[in-house]
């Protein structure tokens, strides 16, 4: 059956850096540890032949995707899909996490992590994101039985994918870690998350 490899880009901060909530308006490159994560992903998938590769316009996803497909002779062209761009965190964009929590509260952040309910002020069209993921899965049904496609995005976007697949693990944590991936298998019109939050 066909597979989609859903990857979250590597780190944009290293140990000792002030970590901020980096959204779609903040275009940071991968940090040193993020580049190492991209290399680890590339090595892990070195024997995987991707028939298609997609990412957002953001540097961090492009760098991660290019590392992963750059290992392959005859690799597919990297296609930018705007919907894969990280969400806009509104007034919390690029703010330190303690300031974000102080503004929205722990309960709002937990609702975002648990069921993807956007906090007040974040510019997130959850229904539209679910619909575009659903459309992508429908298109993926046309892949060949042995085909594998790569999709590199950000955590705020990937978290809406589990809402539209047909089958997923009961204990799935929708948050993808940096440099981690999930696997969606497509069998006809049925989609199934078989793995999530894996790292090399």
Explain the meaning of each model-derived region:
Residues 1-50, 66, 70, 190-200:
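An N-terminal RHG(E/S)-centered segment typical of histidine phosphatases
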Residues 4, 145-153:
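Generic beta-sheet signal
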Residues 10, 155-156:
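Active-site metal-binding loops of divalent metal-dependent hydrolases
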Residues 40-109:
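Phosphate-coordination/substrate-recognition cap region in phosphate-metabolizing enzymes
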Residues 47-49, 140-147:
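Glycine-rich phosphate-binding loop signature in dinucleotide/nucleotide-binding domains
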Residues 67, 160-164:
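Active-site signature of alpha/beta-hydrolase-fold catalytic machinery across serine-
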Residues 106-128:
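Short glycine/proline- and acidic residue-enriched helix-loop micro-motifs
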Residues 168-192:
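Domain-level recognition of soluble alpha/beta enzyme cores
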């Amino acid at each position: 059956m066909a597979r989609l490899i859903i990857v979250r880009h590597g780190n944009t901060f290293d140990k000792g850096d002030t970590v901020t909530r980096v959204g779609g308006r903040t275009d940071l490159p991968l940090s040193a540890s993020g580049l190492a994560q991209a290399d680890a992903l590339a090595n892990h998938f070195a024997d995987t032949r991707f028939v298609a590769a997609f990412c957002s316009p953001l540097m961090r996803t492009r760098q991660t995707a290019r590392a992963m497909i750059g290992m392959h002779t005859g690799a597919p062209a990297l296609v930018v899909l705007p919907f894969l761009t990280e969400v806009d965190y509104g007034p919390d964009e690029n703010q330190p996490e303690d300031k974000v929590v102080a503004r929205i509260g722990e309960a709002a952040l937990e609702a975002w992590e648990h069921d993807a309910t956007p906090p007040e002020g974040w510019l997130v069209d959850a229904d539209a994101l679910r619909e575009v993921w659903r459309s992508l899965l429908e298109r993926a049904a046309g892949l060949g039985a042995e085909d594998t496609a790569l999709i590199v995005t950000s955590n705020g976007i990937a978290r809406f994918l589990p809402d539209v697949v047909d089958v997923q693990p009961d204990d799935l944590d929708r948050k993808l870690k940096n440099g981690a991936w999930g696997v969606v298998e497509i069998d006809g019109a049925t989609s199934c998350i078989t793995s999530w939050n894996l790292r090399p």
